[in-house]
């Protein structure tokens, strides 16, 4: 058995999971509704407050799909019940973030401001900047895949560089720093 796939998916209060035609799993909860098409070989059953996935054989393909879809469904359950939050810190002189509805406006040292239109499922807010601290962008959503994709897209605008650490980084992310060229000259 797959170590991940054999675990049951626990459903918190207020979360319902239903399997629709075409093997589409629909998860509803207080924070929204998500759906995921599951491979035809994987069977999804819901019994009370737990969901269970089974596979027909122990072929490597079935084993990998078993764990994959169990993890995806569990991420959907956590998303509609608790939600996901990603915080990103903008490190650099003059780096700023402004949120106007679903429009994200970033000042990242370019000659122009960068504007990103966020999907409707994602809510963004710029945390108030205290003196001496870097601006922080907070993204919230029920969809883990979508929020991760958007956060990676924002980070790719200015990846942190290894010498001074300037760029957009996730809060708590440890960057590999390098010594400058003066470190080797002795």
PLM regions: where:
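N-terminal intrinsically disordered, cationic/polar leader segments
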Residues: 2-66, 70-186
């Amino acid at each position: 058995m797959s170590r991940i796939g054999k675990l049951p998916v626990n459903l918190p209060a207020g979360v319902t999971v239903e399997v629709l035609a075409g093997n589409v799993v629909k998860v509803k909860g207080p924070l929204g509704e998500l759906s995921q098409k599951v491979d035809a070989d994987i069977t999804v059953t819901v019994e009370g407050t737990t969901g269970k996935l089974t596979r027909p054989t122990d072929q490597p393909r079935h084993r990998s799909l078993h764990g994959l879809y169990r993890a995806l469904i569990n991420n959907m359950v956590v998303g509609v019940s608790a939600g996901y939050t990603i915080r990103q810190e903008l490190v650099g002189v003059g780096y700023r973030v402004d949120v106007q509805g679903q429009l994200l406006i970033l000042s990242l040292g370019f000659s122009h401001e960068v504007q990103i239109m966020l999907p409707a499922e994602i809510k963004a807010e710029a945390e108030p900047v205290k003196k001496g601290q870097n601006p922080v962008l907070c993204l919230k959503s029920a969809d883990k895949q979508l929020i991760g994709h958007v956060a990676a897209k924002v980070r790719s605008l200015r990846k942190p560089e290894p010498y001074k650490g300037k760029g957009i980084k996730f809060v708590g992310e440890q960057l590999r720093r390098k010594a400058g060229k003066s470190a080797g000259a002795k």
